[in-house]
Amino acid sequence: MITTQVQTIALPLAEDPVEKWRPYPLFSGPTPAHDQMACHVSILSPGHSPHLPHEHVEEELLIILDGEADILIADGPRTEGAHVERLRAGSFVYYPAHQYHTIRNCPAAPVTYLMFKWRAEPATTVQLLTTTFHHAEQAPPASASEGFAPRLLFEHPTAYLTKLHAHLTDLKPGAGYPPHADHYDVGIVVLSGRVETLGQVVESCGLIYYSAGELHGMKNVGDTTAQYLVFEFHSPRLPAIE
C-alpha cells in the first residue's frame, strides 16, 4: 500500500549509453483510493524516443523537470500525422486511458521528466478530460500580496477519477499551511525553492505524495519564493474512505 512519502530527485540523472532512455522507479502499488498508482522519473538522451506511440489502460501525467521534448499524440502506433507539441521545464501533459502517445527528445541535451500513472474503478461520468497540455510559460500570474498563492490550471472528471485537479502554487518565505488531511491522494512536484513537509526539506525537482486521509502541512523554509505543481486525484471510492 502506497502511503505518504517524500522523494528526492538529484539531477542530473545518469543516462543509459545503449538504450538512450533510463527510467528510475520511485514507487508503485495500490493506495486507499486507487487500484494502482505508480511514479517514475526518466532521462531521455538527445535524438531518441523510448517507443513508438502506444496506448494502455492507465491514465498518465508527464511533467518535464529539466530540458525540453516533443510530445506526440497519435491515432495509432505510428508517428505519421501525429500532433506534436513541445514541452519545457515546469510544463506537463495529461494522457487519458488508451490515448496513443510518446515522447521524443529533439534538442541537443537530455530531457528529464516525471510520470504519474494510475488506474482505478471507472468513474460514472460522460464528459471526460481529453489530452491536456499545460505550458509553464502560460501559467497565470500569482498575486503579489499573498504568501500562499495557488492558481487553478484545470479540474475535470476522467475515466478513473471523479475529478483530476491541477494547480500551481507560489509560497513566499515563511509562509505555509497547518497539517490537515484530504479525502483524495495528492502529488506535488517542487519546481523551485525549498519547502518543509513531514519533517523533511524538499527542494527543486523533489516529489511529495500525500495519501488520502493522512495529515500533512507545508512551509517555505528557504530565502526565495517556492513554486510547485499540485495534482489532486479524486477517486470514486471517496465515500468508502471518508
Residue positions per predicted region:
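Conserved short histidine dyad/triad with adjacent acidic residue
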Residues: 21-28, 40-56, 154-155, 163-182, ...
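Structural motif
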Residues: 48, 61, 68-70, 100, ...
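A short hydrophobic beta-strand segment most commonly corresponding to one strand
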Residues: 41, 61, 109-124, 209, ...
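Short beta-strand His + acidic residue motifs that chelate non-heme Fe in jelly-roll/DSBH
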Residues: 50-53, 71-72, 83-84, 95, ...
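A short, N-terminal "cap"/entry segment at the start of jelly-roll beta-barrel domains
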Residues: 1-36, 88, 112, 116-163, ...
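Short acidic-glycine-tyrosine-enriched beta hairpin
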Residues: 76-96, 197-216
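Short, conserved beta-strand element in jelly-roll/cupin
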Residues: 43-44, 55-71, 75, 118, ...
